[in-house]
Amino acid sequence: MAPSIRKAIGAVKDQTSIGIAKVASNMAPDLEVAIVKATSHDDDPASEKYIREILNLTSLSRGYILACVTSVSRRLSKTRDWVVALKALMLVHRLLNEGDPIFQEEILYSTRRGTRMLNMSDFRDEAHSSSWDHSAFVRTYAGYLDQRLELALFERKSGVSVNSGGNSSHHSNNDDRYGRGRDDFRSPPPRSYDYENGGGGGSDFRGDNNGYGGVPKRSRSYGDMTEMGGGGGGGGRDEKKVVTPLREMTPERIFGKMGHLQRLLDRFLSLRPTGLAKNSRMILIALYPVVRESFKLYADICEVLAVLLDKFFDMEYSDCVKAFDAYASAAKQIDELIAFYNWCKETGVARSSEYPEVQRITSKLLETLEEFVRDRAKRGKSPERKEIEAPPPVVEEEEPEPDMNEIKALPPPENYTPPPPPEPEPQPEKPQFTEDLVNLREDEVTADDQGNKFALALFAGPPGNNGKWEAFSSNGVTSAWQNPAAEPGKADWELALVETTSNLEKQTAALGGGFDNLLLNGMYDQGMVRQHVSTSQLTGGSASSVALPLPGKTNNQVLALPAPDGTVEKVNQDPFAASLTIPPPSYVQMAEMEKKQYLLSQEQQLWQQYQRDGMRGQASLAKMNTGPVPAYGMPPVNGMGPPPTGYYYNNPY
């Protein structure tokens, strides 16, 4: 259908509706005519003159309000033109913001009676081609107004005041472990608009005085409801219902309030035009007051979020879960709201300076709340608060009455100086005396103790030093024979006496006689050296040989006991010399076997000679001087010659 023909048909319909309203209206024909003119079929916004006329008529009596609700409801239910439906919804929106509060109540009462005036879920435009996007906007706009009435009804029943919650930063004394004290979700400062239509300064979206800004604004929030007296007049308008501050509400009521606000925000976000509706002037004009209301809606949501955050750490587990869900859903809605505002700024809906600074809910805050919910689930119940016991009242003691007969000491004179305390007398230092080397007076030693000390001296371990004296260090020398200062012909006690005179304070207070382990070891070593000297002269056989040379003789041999084992150590001998107790390698054993075979044969010859001539007296000893010549490299077996080097010995002669 051509636009001109459509406009003509629309004008005819409007004139017909006006004529029917003038003739058939029984209650308020002027009101119905004004409603028809305000919701005409032309594409221009409604004139401010008709809007002001409707506002004035509805403010006269409750009957006009009821007639207005009936007329607008009938207009919305019969029309199939999105322009007429959109103008009717804009009129309802204007009456909700600036009209009498009874108009809102009448809409709610009509809803209870079954007349769902704002239920336009089945609306479809049939007058325009390609008007699907416009019809979708009309349906969502009606849903937004309907949800706003639901929120108003909830606040009327519960008596909620969103902005009466006080400052959200009173939690300075609470635990800040999970980020308490955040002021990210406080309400912005109060603005000059409060869910009303139009802007300040008397200019509308078009910029002239014929739009929505010419009527003085009446600041009204959702909770600014009035109680009606029950009569048909407005006698009860001045009686306001007592509101409850948001912070004093129970968690159930706070969650109910938050649910209504979030559902209303969802309806607002769904108002974003799509398709051809983005370029429609009528839709942008209808969107302007809704965007202005969303600023206050966002502030109310931030206020509720701040209250939930303050009470979050003191709630029960079920309430914590609900609060966390509210934060999670609000985070997604705020992201969509930022995108919607950006589109509105680009399109030119309202000025950029009017938009509030929207703050996102950070993922860190959500993670913190989720962690707290998990911890609360593990505990099973909320922690019990410990009541702080009030300190007992201080009982003021009554001052005793002075006794006139009591004897009191006189106060000291003003110039009185107390005498200084006496200085402590210095204690004389005890002189340190050097004890004698042989001191038998300090500790009496019994025969048993002396015997025990002699027994302990035979062990290899050092004796325990419990006295003042300490044994002088031997520097690893365990024997007097290993001391290089010990020369042949110098007694051991002289060396010990020289060393003790220089280190007298380090000596150990021992029993009389000065028993020393080093001297004891030297005595045992002297016996070992003598044994070595005696055995070194008898090197004519192996360890098992009994053919030994006779002392003082060079050719005579006699039988003797076997040589000592390998435990006897030589003094100043090479530490890497072969040991007799450990078998040598195989290549060494071969040479040893040859030597032993030679000695065995020699020993057998000696036994044979002894059997033949040994029993006949001294005459047979002369025959023993002659013997076989030893092989080259074999040691002499007659015991003659100089003694081996490295031994300390005493000449017995």
From Swiss-Prot:
UniProt-annotated location(s): Membrane, Clathrin-coated pit; Golgi apparatus; Cytoplasmic vesicle, Clathrin-coated vesicle
SMART domains per UniProt: ENTH
Gene Ontology biological-process annotations: clathrin coat assembly; clathrin-dependent endocytosis
Modified residues (Phosphothreonine): T244
Residue ranges of the region described as Disordered: 160-240, 376-431
Phosphoserine modifications at: S221
InterPro entries associated with the record: ANTH_dom (IPR011417), ANTH_dom_sf (IPR014712), ANTH_N_plant (IPR048050), AP180-like (IPR045192), ENTH (IPR013809), ENTH_VHS (IPR008942)
GO molecular function: 1-phosphatidylinositol binding; clathrin binding
Biased composition (Acidic residues): 395-404
Biased composition (Pro residues): 410-425
Composition bias, Basic and acidic residues: 172-186, 376-389
Extent of Low complexity compositional bias: 160-171
Segments of skewed composition (Gly residues): 197-214
Alphabetical keyword list: Coated pit, Cytoplasmic vesicle, Endocytosis, Golgi apparatus, Membrane, Phosphoprotein
The keyword Membrane belongs to this UniProt entry's keyword annotation: yes
The ENTH domain, residue ranges: 23-159
Keyword Lyase part of the UniProt annotation: no
PANTHER family: ASSEMBLY PROTEIN, PUTATIVE, EXPRESSED-RELATED, CLATHRIN ASSEMBLY PROTEIN
Protein's name according to its UniProt entry: Putative clathrin assembly protein At2g25430
Phylogenetic lineage: Eukaryota, Viridiplantae, Streptophyta, Embryophyta, Tracheophyta
